C-alpha cells in the first residue's frame, strides 16, 4: 500500500542537531495514550516515550516504555538509529544516520550508513495500549543484526524515575518475547517480535538521562531508566522486523496487526480527503486534510468509556472549555457528527448548579468546576452543531433541559460569585478566583485579574440569552422568552465596555473602573452569532485587535504598548505563568478574529483573500517547525514568535478547520 507523505524533514534539517532536537512527532491511539519523541529518537521531555498509556488502573497517563536504543550491527561496526543525552555528552558520539523523517499514516524514519538503508516506522494501535515499531531493511551489503535495548520508566508522565530497590527486575518468557512486571499495582510490559530473537536478560539501571526541554522549563531534568535486557534479531536485505510493546501479550501475528491498522488509517485518510475536496484551492485542500487528520488525535474514549477531547499533547487532559471550543471543528466539520453529539451529550450529564466542569479528572481527584465560561461556550457549541447539520430533535430532548438549568443557575446566582446583576450583565468571581480562560496564577494569585464583569463573558452571556430566546420560541417554551432582557444587556454592554474616543472595548469592569487594556477577549463581541454591538462598532474592535494583537501566528493576549506586556514565554514555571496571558500569542483566537474580520468587512472578497493568505502562510511555516503536522498551543508575543507550550493543541487545529470552512462558504464576490 503506497503511503502519502504529508510532511517531510530532509537531511538538511535533521543534520543540524540543535534544530533536529526541536522537531517532535506524535502518534495516538484514540484512548488518550500516545507515542512521541524527536525525529532523532532522542527524548528531550519527560513526556516523551514510545508507550505512554492512559491507564484505567492506576488512573492517569504513565510513561511505560520510555526509550528504545536501536542499532544495526554490520561486520565490526554498530550503527545507532537513536540517541540520548547524558551530562556533557550525547550517546552515541558519532554522527547520526537519519536521512529523512516523514509523516504519512505514521511517523517514518529512513537511515543510511555504509551500504545500509533501513526504514523505521512507529504506530500506536487504535483502541489498544500497544505500540508497534517496524524495521524494513531496504539494503544491507552483508547479513547483520538488529540490536534493541528497551528502557522502561513506569511512572506518571509529570514525574521522573530514579533508581530504586522496589523495581522487580525479573523477566518472564512469552511467545517471541518477554514480559516485565516492575511494580505491584502496575500493569506489566510485554515486548514481542514477529520473528525469532535472541534475548539476553541483563537487568541494569542507566542513570542521568537528560531532558533539555525540561531544563528550559525550570523542572528537574534528570532521570534514571531501567533496561531489562537486549534483543538481537538477524537481518539481511529485504528483512522486516516488527516489535510490539504493550500491557498485554499479543496472540495475533504482528504483521496482520500492522496491516489492519495501516488499512484503518488509509480509510480515515480517504474520508479526510473527501471532506477537503469541497475547497477550491489545491493548497487549501491539502491544509484542511492535514488539519482534520491532526485533529483526530484529540478525539478519545476515556478509560471510563466517556467520549472526550484531549485539550493538548503532551500534558493536557480533558478540559471542558477546550472541548466545547474545539468540538465543532474536530467533529461536525470533520465528518464526525455522531462523535460530536456523543461528546455534548456526555458533557451535559456533568452540569451542576448551572456550571459544567472546567476539568474532567483522569485520576482520583474530583472534576473541577472552577469556570464561568465553559457553560457559556456550551450554548455556542450547540449553535455550531445546529449550523452544520445538527439534529434539532436531539437538542430539544437531550440538551434543552441543561441549557435552561444553566441560565437559571446563572440568573439566580451560583458558585464562584457568578450572578446576573441588575443591569443584566454577568458578574463572575472575586479577587482570589481565576475562572475565565485567562486563568494563570503565580503563588496562588491570578496574574490577570479578571473578576467582576469580563467583556468576553458578557458577550458569551448575551449570545446565550439570545439563542435560548430563539429556541424558546421554536420549542413553544414561553418561560424562556427574554426580549426585554436582551435589550437591557445590549444597552448595558455598550455603556459598560465601549470606549467612545478609542472605538474599542475594555477588558473587565469592576468596582466602577473599566480596565482599558487592549486584549483579544473583545473580539468575541463581534465574532459570536449574536453580537451585543451595533454593526457600526464592529470595525473599531476589529481594527484595534488587528493593529495591536495580530501576529503571523495568532493573537497576542496583550498589546505590546502595555506596561505589563511580556514578549517572551520562557524560564521557570512562575516566569512562564506570568507571561501566559500577558502578551503570549494564542492561535485558537485566529478563528474568532477571522470570523469578526469577515463580519466587519465592507469588501468581503478582499477580506477573504487576506485571511486565506494569512492561514496559508502560517501553515506553510509552522507545520514542520515544532510538532510535525501539529499546531502548537502558544507562541512568543515578540518576533520571531517561537512556538511553545504543547506541541499539538486541540483548539488551535479546530479553529483553523472552522475558519477554513467559513471562508470556503463565503462567495468571492
Task: Describe each model-derived feature in a short phrase.
Residues 358, 411, 415-423, 427, ...:
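Catalytic cores of carbohydrate-active enzymes
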Residues 226-231, 306-323, 362-375, 439, ...:
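Solvent-exposed loop and edge beta-strand segments that line ligand/cofactor-binding
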Residues 79-106, 113-117, 412, 543-553, ...:
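Non-catalytic C-terminal accessory modules of carbohydrate-active enzymes
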Residues 268-313, 342, 346, 560-564:
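Conserved oxyanion/phosphate-binding beta-strand-loop segments in alpha/beta enzyme cores
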Residues 209-218, 293-306, 347-357, 431-443, ...:
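Active-site-adjacent bridging/hinge elements
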Residues 139-140, 161-164, 182, 235-237, ...:
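Aromatic-rich carbohydrate-recognition surfaces in CAZymes
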Residues 1-280, 314, 321, 332, ...:
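Terminal accessory carbohydrate-recognition/targeting modules of carbohydrate-active enzymes
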Residues 257-275, 287-291, 335-349, 392-412, ...:
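Extended, well-ordered alpha-helical scaffold segments
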Amino acid at each position: 500500500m503506497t503511503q502519502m507523505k504529508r510532511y517531510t524533514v530532509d537531511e538538511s534539517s535533521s543534520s543540524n542537531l540543535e534544530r533536529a532536537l526541536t522537531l517532535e512527532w506524535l502518534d495516538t491511539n484514540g484512548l488518550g495514550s500516545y507515542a512521541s519523541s524527536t525525529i532523532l529518537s532522542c527524548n528531550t521531555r519527560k513526556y516523551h516515550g514510545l508507550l505512554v498509556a492512559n491507564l484505567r488502573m492506576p488512573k492517569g497517563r504513565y510513561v511505560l516504555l520510555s526509550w528504545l536504543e536501536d542499532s544495526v550491527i554490520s561486520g565490526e561496526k554498530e550503527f545507532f538509529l537513536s540517541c540520548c543525552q547524558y551530562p556533557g555528552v550525547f550517546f552515541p558520539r558519532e554522527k547520526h544516520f537519519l536521512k529523512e523523517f516523514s509523516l504519512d499514516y505514521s511517523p517514518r524514519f529512513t537511515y543510511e550508513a555504509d551500504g545500509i538503508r533501513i526504514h523505521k516506522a512507529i504506530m500506536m494501535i487504535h483502541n489498544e495500549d500497544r505500540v508497534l515499531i517496524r524495521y524494513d531493511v531496504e539494503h544491507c551489503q552483508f547479513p547483520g543484526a538488529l540490536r534493541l535495548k528497551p528502557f522502561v520508566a513506569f511512572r506518571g508522565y509529570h514525574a521522573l524515575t530514579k533508581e530504586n530497590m522496589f523495581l522487580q527486575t525479573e523477566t518472564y518468557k512469552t511467545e517471541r518475547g518477554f514480559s516485565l512486571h516492575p511494580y505491584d499495582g502496575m500493569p506489566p510490559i510485554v515486548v514481542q517480535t514477529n520473528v525469532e530473537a535472541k534475548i539476553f536478560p541483563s537487568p541494569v539501571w542507566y542513570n542521568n538521562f537528560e531532558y533539555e526541554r525540561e531544563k528550559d522549563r525550570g523542572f528537574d531534568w534528570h532521570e534514571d531508566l531501567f533496561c531489562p535486557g537486549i534483543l538481537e534479531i538477524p537481518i539481511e536485505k529485504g528483512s522486516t522486523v516488527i516489535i510490539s510493546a504493550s500491557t498485554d501479550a499479543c496472540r495475533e501475528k504482528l504483521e496482520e496487526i500492522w496491516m489492519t491498522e495501516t488499512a484503518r488509517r488509509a480509510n480515515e485518510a480517504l474520508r479526510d480527503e473527501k471532506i477537503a475536496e469541497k475547497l477550491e484551492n489545491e493548497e487549501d485542500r491539502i491544509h484542511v486534510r492535514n488539519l482534520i487528520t491532526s485533529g483526530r488525535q484529540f478525539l478519545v474514549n476515556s478509560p471510563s468509556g466517556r467520549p472526550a477531547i484531549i485539550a493538548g499533547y503532551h500534558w493536557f487532559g480533558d478540559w471542558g472549555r477546550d472541548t466545547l471550543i474545539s468540538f465543532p471543528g474536530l467533529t461536525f466539520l470533520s465528518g464526525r457528527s455522531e462523535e460530536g453529539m456523543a461528546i455534548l451529550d456526555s458533557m451535559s450529564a456533568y452540569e451542576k448548579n448551572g456550571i459544567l466542569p472546567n476539568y474532567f479528572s483522569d485520576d482520583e481527584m474530583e472534576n473541577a468546576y472552577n469556570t464561568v465560561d465553559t457553560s457559556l461556550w456550551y450554548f455556542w457549541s450547540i449553535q455550531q452543531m445546529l449550523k452544520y447539520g445538527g439534529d434539532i430533535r436531539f437538542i430539544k430532548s437531550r440538551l434543552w433541559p441543561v441549557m435552561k438549568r444553566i441560565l437559571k443557575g446563572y440568573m439566580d446566582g451560583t458558585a464562584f460569585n457568578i450572578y446576573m446583576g441588575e443591569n443584566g450583565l454577568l458578574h463572575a468571581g472575586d479577587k482570589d478566583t481565576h475562572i475565565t480562560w485567562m486563568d494563570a496564577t503565580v503563588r496562588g494569585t491570578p496574574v490577570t485579574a479578571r473578576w467582576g464583569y469580563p467583556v468576553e463573558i458578557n458577550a458569551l452571556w448575551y449570545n446565550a440569552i439570545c439563542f435560548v430566546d430563539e429556541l424558546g420560541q421554536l420549542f413553544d417554551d414561553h418561560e424562556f422568552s427574554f426580549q426585554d432582557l436582551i435589550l437591557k444587556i445590549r444597552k448595558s454592554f455598550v455603556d459598560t465596555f465601549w470606549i467612545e474616543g478609542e472605538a474599542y472595548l475594555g477588558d473587565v469592569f469592576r468596582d466602577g473602573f473599566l480596565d482599558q487594556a487592549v486584549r483579544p477577549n473583545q473580539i468575541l463581541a463581534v465574532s459570536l452569532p449574536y453580537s451585543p454591538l451595533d454593526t457600526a462598532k464592529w470595525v473599531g474592535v476589529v481594527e484595534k485587535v488587528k493593529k495591536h494583537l495580530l501576529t503571523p501566528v495568532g493573537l497576542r493576549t496583550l498589546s505590546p504598548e502595555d506596561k505589563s506586556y511580556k514578549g517572551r514565554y520562557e524560564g521557570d514555571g512562575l516566569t512562564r505563568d506570568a507571561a501566559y496571558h500577558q502578551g503570549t500569542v494564542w492561535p485558537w483566537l485566529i478563528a474568532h478574529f477571522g470570523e469578526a474580520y469577515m463580519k466587519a468587512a465592507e469588501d468581503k472578497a478582499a477580506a477573504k483573500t487576506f485571511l486565506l493568505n494569512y492561514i496559508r502562510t502560517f501553515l506553510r511555516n509552522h507545520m514542520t517547525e515544532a510538532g510535525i503536522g501539529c499546531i502548537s498551543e502558544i507562541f512568543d508575543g515578540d518576533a520571531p514568535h517561537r512556538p511553545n507550550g504543547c506541541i499539538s493543541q486541540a483548539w488551535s487545529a479546530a479553529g483553523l478547520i472552522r475558519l477554513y470552512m467559513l471562508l470556503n462558504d463565503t462567495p468571492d464576490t
